[in-house]
UniProtKB/Swiss-Prot annotation:
This is Glutamate-1-semialdehyde 2,1-aminomutase. Its EC number is 5.4.3.8. The gene is hemL. The modification N6-(pyridoxal phosphate)lysine is found at K273. It comes from Polynucleobacter asymbioticus (strain DSM 18221 / CIP 109841 / QLW-P1DMWA-1) (Polynucleobacter necessarius subsp. asymbioticus). Pathway: Porphyrin-containing compound metabolism; protoporphyrin-IX biosynthesis; 5-aminolevulinate from L-glutamyl-tRNA(Glu): step 2/2. GO terms for biological process: protoporphyrinogen IX biosynthetic process. InterPro entries: 4pyrrol_synth_GluAld_NH2Trfase (IPR004639), Aminotrans_3 (IPR005814), Aminotrans_3_PPA_site (IPR049704), PyrdxlP-dep_Trfase (IPR015424), PyrdxlP-dep_Trfase_major (IPR015421), PyrdxlP-dep_Trfase_small (IPR015422).
Amino acid sequence: MTKRDQNEVLFERAQKTIPGGVNSPVRAFRQVGGTPRFISKAKGPYFWDAENKRYIDLIMSWGPMIAGHANPEVVEAVQKAAETSFSYGAPTEGEIELAERICALVPSIEQVRMVSSGTEATMSALRLARGYTNRDLIIKFEGCYHGHADSLLVKAGSGLLTFADSTQNAPSSGGVPQDLVKHTLVLPYNDVEAIEAVFKKQGNEIAAVILEPIAGNMNLIKPSAEFLKALRDLTSQYGSVLIYDEVMTGFRVALGGAQSLQGIVPDLTCLGKVMGGGMPMAAFGGKKEIMSKLAPLGNVYQAGTLSGNPVAVAAGLKTLEIVSRAGFYECLSAQTEKLMLGLKQGADKSGIPFAVDSVGGMFGFYFADAVPSTYEAVTKTNIDAFKKFFHLMLDEGVYLAPSAYEAGFTSIAHDDAVLQVIIDAAEKSFPQLR
C-alpha cells in the first residue's frame, strides 16, 4: 500500500474542524492549486513540511522573520520573558522600552499604542482619525489591504484578490453591509488626478487617507513621488489625517520604514510583523496631538487584553536591536537585489516575459513585460504562468508566495549559497514555461 503524503493527510484532517483547513485564506493554495504544506519546523532561511522535506522560505511568515527563523538571540529573549509569565494584563517596563525604541526609529511617531494584530492597528487608527477630525469619510486605494476590518474590505488586496470579485464597487467580503462601506471611498493607486478630484469635491468631509506606502498585497507596487506629494499636500490642506499602513513595510524595507525612504511625514503610522519578531504584535502611533484623543486621555476607545504582552515585547525589542546593527539593511537589500537579478536573467535566457522589483528585504516578480504600477495592471499579468512556476519551484524545494498577488520576503539568513540554489531552481523551471 502506497504511503499517503502527510501534507494531504493533515489537510484532509484540518478541513473537518477548521473552515477550509486553514486559519488564513491564502494558505489554502486556492490560486495555485494543490495541497498546502504543513510546517513542522523552521530554521534560518528554511522550513520543513510534514514529509520532512526542506524548503527555502521566500515568504518568511509574510515578512516578520527578517532575522531568519528561530534566530537564537530572539529565541533566548522569548524564553527569558516566558519564564516570568506570558501575560499580566498590567503595564510593564518592557512596553515603555519598545515604545521608546519605535519613537526613536520612526520620528513621525511621537506616541505609540501597542495592539496584537495589523487589523487592530489599522482599525484603531481609522477610528482615532475619525474621532480627531469629527468626520466620517475615509479614502483607501484599489488593491491595498489593511486587514479585515469591515470598512476596509472594499477592493482590497491580499487573499481577497484571489477569493472575491473585486471589480465591483461593493464590499469584497460577504457579511459587510453596503451601508457600512458607504463611508469608504476607493481610488486607483498612483492616480494623482483622482485624488485631487475627490478632495476638491469632498475634502472637508474626509477624515483620513490610508495607504500602503509600498503596496505589498497586489504583489509589490511602488508609489510615484507625485502621488505621495499630492496625498501629503491635500490632507494637510483639508485637515485630513494621512495614515501610512507600514504593517508590512515598517522595519522591513528600511530601519525607518518606507516613509524614511520617501521623505513623507505621515500623521499616523501602523506597524506590525517585523516589530513583533514573529509574535502577535502590532502598533499604531503618530502625532501626540492626535494620539492624546485615545482613552484614557480622550474619548476614542481602544483596548486589548493581550496588547503589549511581555513575550511579544521581548521578541520585538530583540528583533529591533538586530535590525539596528550597522550594515543590516545594506546587506539585506543587496541580497534581495541579487536574487531578483538572478531570476530576471534566468527568465531572459528562456525568452519568458518577466519583470522584477524590490526594496529592502521585500520583492515582487511578475510574468509581464514591465513592472506594473496599478491594481488593474497587476490583474493583467500572466497568472497561469505564475501558477506553473510556483509548482515547479516548489518541486525544487523553493517556497514562493502561493498567490501572484503577494509580495515575497527575504531575511538576513538568505546568504549567497541559498540565493544560488533559488536561482538554479528558477533556471531549471523557466524553460518548462515556454
